[in-house]
Amino acid sequence: MNVSHNSSIDHNDLAKRGESLIRKSTNRYLTTVRIAFRAKQRRFDDFDGLLEESSIKPVQRSIIELSDEQDQPDLLPG
């Protein structure tokens, strides 16, 4: 799923990604905290661009990012 400022979210895909994150995790609570922490980071990162209204909420964006990282670990730096 391509994440851009002007795209809309496929809610079924988002639900599947969230379910996959939780299903593959060993601790549902920590997964939820990771999603919330990433969303908080993204919210403050996007704070500078207040004039650009994003159609994707920070929690939705964090689920997509964490799901992509889980499914494609070779894309991670380091």
Swiss-Prot record:
A single Pfam family it belongs to is RNA_pol_Rpb6
NCBIfam families with a match to the protein in the record: PRK00392.2-5
Record gene name:
rpoZ
Annotated HAMAP family: RNApol_bact_RpoZ
Which InterPro entries did the record assign? DNA-dir_RNA_pol_omega (IPR003716), Pol_omega/Rpo6/RPB6 (IPR006110)
Keywords annotated in UniProt: DNA-directed RNA polymerase, Nucleotidyltransferase, Transcription, Transferase
Q: What does this protein do?
A: Promotes RNA polymerase assembly. Latches the N- and C-terminal regions of the beta' subunit thereby facilitating its interaction with the beta and alpha subunits.
Catalyses: RNA(n) + a ribonucleoside 5'-triphosphate = RNA(n+1) + diphosphate
Organism classification: Bacteria, Bacillati, Cyanobacteriota, Cyanophyceae, Synechococcales
Top-level class of the enzyme under EC nomenclature: transferase
Q: What is this protein called?
A: DNA-directed RNA polymerase subunit omega
What does the similarity note say?
Answer: Belongs to the RNA polymerase subunit omega family.
Q: Subunit structure, briefly?
A: In cyanobacteria the RNAP catalytic core is composed of 2 alpha, 1 beta, 1 beta', 1 gamma and 1 omega subunit. When a sigma factor is associated with the core the holoenzyme is formed, which can initiate transcription.
Task: Give the Enzyme Commission number.
Answer: 2.7.7.6
One GO term of the biological process aspect: DNA-templated transcription
Cellular component per GO? DNA-directed RNA polymerase complex
The entry lists its GO molecular-function terms as: DNA binding; DNA-directed RNA polymerase activity
